[in-house]
Amino acid sequence: MAQYGMIIDLEKCIGCHACAVACKAEWDVPAAEGRNWVKRLGPSMTADGLASTYYPGLCNHCDSPACVGACPADPVKMEFKDRKSGAAKIMEVAATWKDPFDGTVQIDKERCLGCGACAEACPYGARYVNPDLGEEGKADKCTFCTERTAVGLEPACVQTCLAGARIFGDLSDPDSAVAEYVKKGAIRLDSDAVKIGPNVRYYGRKRDLTLLAESCVPKIMPQASLRRVLLARLAKQVVKGARKNSLLDFFG
């Protein structure tokens, strides 16, 4: 199985936000939200010296994505196909899943409930509910521009990066550019509590990587809190649906 991933080279990133702007333009992302973001970190003192860098973030398309297990949508059987070999596999999935052939995490907007459970479950804050999609909104996030890569194009953020700081490819291919960065020491953003295998990695000076790791610690919402959020949102949808049906009956 391939595992698509991305390297962010912090030695090259200039914090211009062109990647985030390109993503918004490509996917019509609301102004207040972002599939991609760039945050300034520092200057701050670390154990490795004074550091100042940027945190370009996006969905990590994790090995064991917390968002997938959090989705409450009824599962259905779906057929997945490998772009290269043509091999097929049938899996039962909810409204979000990890593709068995390319390792990306995707969303079925038609079946998404808009409850936001997946967004709450993501330890990286990489998901949000887009209020412009459907009556109740739909979950949205970076897809690694799967529609673009399917026809041989790079993700919009990679193509637009002025400094060449974003590198996209197959991490499972030892000869790929992304795999070479891993060999050189590109790191994952994880923590003692969160080890779900993010497939976006960061490369740079040791002090900058230290600042990044200390500033951007992934956190998983406690299950009890997640359940409360989910139940509250689902209850809101049920009440709204009931009111709508009552009005239809009244005027029907």
Question: What do the PLM-derived regions correspond to, one by one?
Answer:
Residues M1-G252:
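Non-ligating segments of multi-cofactor redox enzymes
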